[in-house]
Amino acid sequence: MPSQDKEIDKIFLIGAGGFLGAVCRFLLCELVEGQLGILSVNVIGSFMLGMIMYDTEYLGFIGPKGKIAFGTGFMGAFTTFSTFAVQSFSLPFIPALGNISANIFLTLTGVFFGRSVIKALSSREI
């Protein structure tokens, strides 16, 4: 039973994080509408997830439960690849290419900067 309790704890952490992530995404997309809203969500999310993933490896500030709650739950609900894909598909060809390029470049840049913040804080080479 202890193993089953740990799984239930993980599911609860993911669900609670997911709830908060979905609410935050909704609020940000209300503030910044359309493709720019989804781009903002995905770039911010990539930056934060980059920090979370590298923190758990190099600083250890967040810990395993935080990684589950924030990395899997919150970020999983906050970011949205599927909405980005649907929006891109619904645009004319040239604007779609711009949206796709911006999302890919800026989200990878977000991860890079999230990693860089953790690298600077840890003073260790990644």
Swiss-Prot record:
Keyword Cell membrane included in the entry's annotation: yes
Catalysed transformations (reactions): fluoride(in) = fluoride(out)
Activity regulation note: Na(+) is not transported, but it plays an essential structural role and its presence is essential for fluoride channel function.
Transmembrane domains' residue ranges: 11-31, 34-54, 66-86, 93-113
GO molecular-function term, one example from the UniProt record: fluoride channel activity
One Gene Ontology cellular component annotation held by this UniProt entry: plasma membrane
Localisation per UniProt entry: Cell membrane
Family, per entry: Belongs to the fluoride channel Fluc/FEX (TC 1.A.43) family.
Protein's name in the database: Fluoride-specific ion channel FluC 2
Organism: Methanosarcina acetivorans (strain ATCC 35395 / DSM 2834 / JCM 12185 / C2A)
Lineage: Archaea, Methanobacteriati, Methanobacteriota, Stenosarchaea group, Methanomicrobia
